[in-house]
Amino acid sequence: MRLSNYYIPTLKETSADVSVVSHKYSIRAGLIKQIASGIYTWLPLGLRVLRNIENIVREEMNKSGALEVLMPLIQPASLWKESGRYDDYGSEMLRITDRNQREMLFGPTHEEVITDTLRTTLTSHKNLPITLYQIQWKFRDELRPRYGIMRCREFLMKDAYSFDKDLSGAILSYNLMFKTYIKIFKNLGLTPIAVKAESGPIGGNLSHEFHVLANSGESTLYYDQEIIELMNSDNIDIERIKNTYTAADDMHDPQTCPIPPNNIKTSKGIEIGHIFYLGDKYSKPMNANFCDNNDSKPLQMGCYGIGISRLVAAIIEVFHDNKGITWPEEISPFKFSLVNLYSSNDKCIKVAENLHMQLHNDVLYDDTDDSPGIKLTRTDLLGMPWQIIIGKSTVEQDLIEVRNRSNKDKFLISVEQFLKKFKK
């Protein structure tokens, strides 16, 4: 992709009210544009990151056996009244009335819709267990949206819902999603920490949050250092993870904590996922039942959320330096930045054009007439994992310079050897 044909409205600075790194860099790098408080347009570069995260999430969800659906953003209020949850969200829920004076709402979550779907379409207990998921926009009218896309009002979420016959089956589904979430976050280049959590207005009596450590996090986490090793292990042991002490500030009690104070680690964390065992909280009041040996029983449910748009902010909080973003290769909008420092030099142009053609969709090619300094500053800000620098002195030696954006390593290499090493 040629930068001259692409749209990346970069900025040198942001306003004084932009306080966290991810908010600053997502604006300066042209990922997003604020439209209203807590509401953003995703620009081309940001949308590529969002789609890359979606693809990683979708791949692991599909591997788990979950099936993708798509539910409506606009929901009838009657379903929420039926579940008994209509008033729980208070002012966070945006309520509307259609032309026939029917009460509707913008979905802050989809437990009621998926429960209604299953109660009217599930024909046999032989279809159980089943887990359905979607990747869909949500709206919650946050009182104080802040930190850009980390805490906004409209956000992209992966939400999944499991349905089982009994408690033992529901716990198996819960543990499967627990393990799937660890895989997802590790595939994104993150080390998550799972902590026991309150269920809040979602409900249920078993819940875990997944956090990534970051100084800008809103939660304070208390944990046994062993949890980091368990989360990074190739062999994911769910029971050991569950039994290793971790807690957010609202669940941590120093008086009852089983870990000696000098063994407890304390860090700030950003919540990036949340899983719940719901039991029959929704199925019972909404009569979502299944028949087994002529006996009608409420479905046992679980729900599982990942904030996909929030993950963009969390990843920037973890992967950045004082020059800009340092994207992990797995989700970077492009794998390579190609920078021709001398856009009027025929030999430099020839080498750059050849690399652009060879790398195709994996490269953002800065073919502008801007000065070398501006180009290098911009490519550091945008944060692609590999920078290919085309300069006159190196081209004369039939070499190009390659820089690793993350660890700052750089080396000279011929185009031929580079393509052998890096081209898919």
UniProtKB/Swiss-Prot annotation:
Catalytic activity: tRNA(Pro) + L-proline + ATP = L-prolyl-tRNA(Pro) + AMP + diphosphate
KW Protein biosynthesis (keyword) present: yes
InterPro entries with a match to the protein in the record: aa-tRNA-synt_IIb, aa-tRNA-synth_II, aa-tRNA-synth_II/BPL/LPL, Anticodon-bd, Anticodon-bd_dom_sf, Pro-tRNA-ligase_IIa, Pro-tRNA-synth_IIa_bac-type, Pro-tRNA_synthetase
Location(s), subcellular: Cytoplasm
Cellular component per GO, a single term: cytosol
Family annotation (SUPFAM superfamilies): Class II aaRS ABD-related, Class II aaRS and biotin synthetases
Pfam families for this protein: HGTP_anticodon (PF03129), tRNA-synt_2b (PF00587)
Chief location bin: cytoplasm
GO terms of molecular function: ATP binding; proline-tRNA ligase activity
CDD domains: ProRS_anticodon_short, ProRS_core_prok
Keywords carried by this UniProt record: Aminoacyl-tRNA synthetase, ATP-binding, Cytoplasm, Ligase, Nucleotide-binding, Protein biosynthesis
EC numbers: 6.1.1.15
Class of enzymatic activity (EC top level): ligase
Keyword Coiled coil included in the entry's annotation: no
Highest taxon above the source species: Bacteria
Self-association state and partner proteins as the record states: Homodimer.
Function of the molecule: Catalyzes the attachment of proline to tRNA(Pro) in a two-step reaction: proline is first activated by ATP to form Pro-AMP and then transferred to the acceptor end of tRNA(Pro).
Membership in a protein family: Belongs to the class-II aminoacyl-tRNA synthetase family. ProS type 2 subfamily.
Name of the protein this chain belongs to: Proline--tRNA ligase
Organism from which the protein derives: Ehrlichia canis (strain Jake)
Organism placement in taxonomy: Bacteria, Pseudomonadati, Pseudomonadota, Alphaproteobacteria, Rickettsiales
